Amino acid sequence: MLNIVMIGCGAIGAGVLELLENDPQLRVDAVIVPRDSETQVRHRLASLRRPPRVLSALPAGERPDLLVECAGHRAIEQHVLPALAQGIPCLVVSVGALSEPGLVERLEAAAQAGGSRIELLPGAIGAIDALSAARVGGLESVRYTGRKPASAWLGTPGETVCDLQRLEKARVIFDGSAREAARLYPKNANVAATLSLAGLGLDRTQVRLIADPESCENVHQVEASGAFGGFELTLRGKPLAANPKTSALTVYSVVRALGNHAHAISI
């Protein structure tokens, strides 16, 4: 059985814990949350058949088989970098954080120093394998369009573009590079950043973000072309009830990645 420590226990982390309840090969031994949230999270997880320990930091000398980040961008700095340097392999959900200048290089250096490895999870998007394979032969263009319910953009710069609460028809709230999208919309940047890292990079990947009052799904569209030919992907993801900014597929992506580490055959 893999010994797993998870950073964060919000909508994504809680969903992962629930799905792992009946998997005999996978167990989250501990979750790491801010100190002032420990009691609340411990109470919330008490109903699980196998509740994990709730900690504010990884105890000195403790070496789990895997550390899984489900907590947002700050957790990369606080927990993932030190874990990699200590030789602990890490899975990362908050790929948008890697748009920060120099962070990719720091993560790579920490992993090399510790002899460990970092795996970036696809989360809410698919076709990452096809995109990264196409890059080998030469990519020419990659465009990502993200369409979400208007309410999912509350608390973002989209509020300065239009009145999201009174929006009557779909409105483009951003059109530019993936790097700029990640800077302005960090909580919605994971898909764009993942596509960029797999393909043409943050500056050459084009991003369009749309607020749609008639949509009840998070719709991700990817168009790519190059020496390989081209492809178009449309993925309609149901948002998590606990967080409309996040697709439920993100939770399933984490569980799938953990299964690939635990089981004899992975795909």
UniProtKB/Swiss-Prot annotation:
Residue intervals passing through the bilayer: none
Keyword Transmembrane attached: no
Binding positions for NAD(+) per the UniProt entry: A124, N190
Any one Gene Ontology molecular-function term assigned to this protein's record: aspartate dehydrogenase activity
Record has Oxidoreductase as a keyword: yes
Catalytic activity, EC: 1.4.1.21
Signal peptide range in chain numbering: none
UniProt enzyme class: oxidoreductase
Residues annotated as the enzyme's active site: H220
One Gene Ontology biological process: NAD biosynthetic process
Reactions it catalyzes: L-aspartate + NADP(+) + H2O = oxaloacetate + NH4(+) + NADPH + H(+); L-aspartate + NAD(+) + H2O = oxaloacetate + NH4(+) + NADH + H(+)
Pathway noted in the entry: Cofactor biosynthesis; NAD(+) biosynthesis; iminoaspartate from L-aspartate (dehydrogenase route): step 1/1
Keywords, alphabetical: NAD, NADP, Oxidoreductase, Pyridine nucleotide biosynthesis
Cited function: Specifically catalyzes the NAD or NADP-dependent dehydrogenation of L-aspartate to iminoaspartate.
Additional remarks: The iminoaspartate product is unstable in aqueous solution and can decompose to oxaloacetate and ammonia.
Entry's family note: Belongs to the L-aspartate dehydrogenase family.
This protein's name: L-aspartate dehydrogenase
Source species: Pseudomonas aeruginosa (strain ATCC 15692 / DSM 22644 / CIP 104116 / JCM 14847 / LMG 12228 / 1C / PRS 101 / PAO1)
